[in-house]
């Protein structure tokens, strides 16, 4: 982790720097906020800024963001003046570290803010095969395309590959191609010279140069404009880039990783992605299975997130109840690991008893998780779905959806909660669908007695 310290290195701040270095940080130093912005602009990469709270933190953050240099900031200061600490947080600092420093606090803050040491939590055989392949190709210089649904952990996998590579001690730089406007992405990747365009007040080093010697991750590369893909292809082939407004090519030594949640082969057919670029990137493909295809990972991930967020919130770590585990495994998790992480974060905060009960685990819409269906009910619903699928040819999507919901509900004996769980939708969504069908005159199976059966 690269730490840029901003402020005068005297007394307690110097001690804090030594503690950060002992915690594994690679530390560099400037005295003023202007020097900090200039250092970032010149390509001195940083994962975190530690800034003395007597300096203009708001101005520093504004100056950096004006040039799209979004590096998290933690404030620090002697005597822990409450007003100054509050103002630093209000200005945009993620955390405040009081000085004299505490070694454990500094290590915890560095880990929490940068969050770049996410381990690979793997128990399921499907994911173990992916890890095995990643371990094989990580030491090479091959470009790797990491594919999978949104939230399945593609960036975590990219960091894992970098950590296992021969470039592990060099920078890992990530660019989200979907989050940066098309007209700015070229400058973000390749940098620009002073005066290259309106607002280019100074030379800016791009991500390719910042990653020199290390790894560059092109996140969601499928969202990149076709015109820019041509320039990217040349940079990958020639290992040199042209800054916007520059006259001389710049050599770079990097390894390229890329991620996508779209089918790039189909994008090639649609004309939105270059076939030659796909071949360059897809030397090795690591496909991350969605969470629903690796159920053995669910509880291990849950326990990891409980530990993480209990520590982050100063809450005693609790075990997960047996019923909660059953529901967690049965849920389909359309948002994958990201959705599961958010659910467990909420559960840590909402749990009131000695265990994390099933009622503390809430879905994104605030609804509790549905009970796990018993085997007989699940098998009956599957048979209903199989039988229905044979009659779906020639029907509209809405008609297919309606028939599937009605058939599943019938085989769940009217139990709304069980049916919603099998269908992979929330109970609220199911009830809204059933009301819509009833209003249209469709016969809806009545609810039966028992927990979760009420309409």
From Swiss-Prot:
The keyword Phosphoprotein applies. It is found in: Cytoplasm. Residues 416-435 bind DNA. One of its GO terms (biological process) is phosphorelay signal transduction system. Keywords: Activator, ATP-binding, Bacterial flagellum biogenesis, Cytoplasm, DNA-binding, Nucleotide-binding, Phosphoprotein, Transcription, Transcription regulation, Two-component regulatory system. One of its GO terms (cellular component) is cytoplasm. Residues 2-114 form the Response regulatory domain. One of its GO terms (molecular function) is sequence-specific DNA binding. ATP binds at residues 148-155, 211-220. InterPro entries: AAA+_ATPase, CheY-like_superfamily, Homeodomain-like_sf, HTH_Fis, P-loop_NTPase, Sig_transdc_resp-reg_receiver, Sigma_54_int, Sigma_54_int_dom_ATP-bd_1. Residues 120-349 form the Sigma-54 factor interaction domain. Coiled coil: none annotated. Pfam families: HTH_8, Sigma54_activat. FldB is transcribed during a very brief time in the cell cycle just before the periodic expression of FlbG and its other target genes. Activation of sigma-54-dependent flagellar gene promoters and strong negative autoregulatory effects on its own promoter. The synthesis and function of FlbD in C.crescentus is controlled by an internal cell-cycle clock. This is Transcriptional regulatory protein FlbD. The gene is flbD.
